[in-house]
Amino acid sequence: MAAEARRPVLVVLHQEHSTPGRVGLRLAARGHPLDVRRPRFGDVLPETLDGHAGAIVFGGPMSINDPDDFLKRETDWLAVPLKENAPLLGLCLGAQMLARHLGAAVGTHADGHIEIGWFGLTATSAGEALTRWPDRVHQFHREGFGLPAGATLLAEGSAETFPNQAFSYGPAAFAIQFHIELTTAMVNRWTQRIGDRARLPGGQAAHLHFEGRALHDWKTSTFLDAFLDIWLGRDSRQGRAAAE
């Protein structure tokens, strides 16, 4: 008898032509179809995740502090996976949405610092207990988040700029500020749009993005495989296996 088809993963994207990158490729390799939705362009998010293995909310150039209605709707919608204890992952903007939903502040650095390029990362003891984390990661953000009450900090950046880099909340929700989804093609597109931001505090020129990728991206790739298995394995709804 053929194995039961695996449940799809809900993928929330914020630009018309954006993709889930290698996160999507790794999920597809595990047999999970991708249910891609773009609420910014009118797609409706589901009222339940009962038919999904989990949900991933990706990043985008907008700010959670922008007045657009779709940002508030998405942030409010996070109550659905949180209530159901469905696996939930927020990446970059998605991480900031989760932090905001849980009551934490999200905003720019007081001295105008940004993180665009490769920066150091240190796992906390809780993070080390979860898996092995990369020690340098690819960042592309101008805002950071506070640690929500009841959340567990998993990874830290610089104490002077953006110290909170990853956290977990409850049994199955995770937020990661840095980018684990980037393919080389995505880096090429993104670095073409850096412009004057490379001259801001914490901005790096395009060639440094590729140098960092050549030196350090293998660690993020290894982390991604391990983390996805852990994340999918957190699905305890009705005792079912997350991989179904």
Language-model-detected regions and their locations in the chain:
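C-terminal helical/coil "lid" or tail adjacent to the Rossmann-like core of SAM-dependent
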Residues: 171-210
